[in-house]
């Protein structure tokens, strides 16, 4: 690898990963600076409080730094670190035994909240109408780019259950975010 650049800000993520794998901490610092808010935003969407999102994001970047040599560049660094963060957050939930409570809450939260075209809200507000399990499933499949199978494995739920939560969550979001003219919103899943 050629000499170290004076500034890492102009380098592509793949180049930064190479420098970081060679032990250059400043290169990884630039990666964390670039992608830290997106990771925290994903965690907030998954239901983490601000301080908890900060803690999990910090842990995820520490894990990514320790495992940077494992990053093969098959996807983006951003997607890789988001998957690490999502999995760490889910493990945290499991440790606190919240997943059992989430499944019970899901049954109670079956009512669909309709959207009033005059009072349309943004996606963050719309996500609040989802049950916690729906929010987790939608966030993992669309925010972190996991497949339904990967989300099912991460949540330790049957594949069909995850698909149902995603479908129901998307229906609620479409209803809540429906444009005034009644046009249908199209959803797109992330990579994975």
Residues of each region from the PLM?
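Short, small-hydrophobic-rich alpha-helical interface motif
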Residues: 20, 39, 43, 53-64, ...
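Amphipathic, Lys/Arg- and hydrophobic-enriched alpha-helical face
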Residues: 30-50, 67, 127, 176-179
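Sigma70-family region 2
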Residues: 21-22, 47-48, 58-76, 95-96, ...
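Helix-turn-helix DNA-binding module
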Residues: 128-136, 140, 144-161, 172
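Arg/Lys-rich amphipathic alpha helix in sigma70-family domain 2
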Residues: 66-73, 83-103, 179
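C-terminal edge and immediately downstream basic/flexible tail or linker adjoining helix-turn-helix-like DNA-binding
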Residues: 2-7, 153-154, 170-192
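Internal acidic/polar
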Residues: 5, 9-13, 91, 97-125, ...
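Short, charged helix-capping/linker segments at alpha-helix termini
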Residues: 2-7, 21-30, 40-59
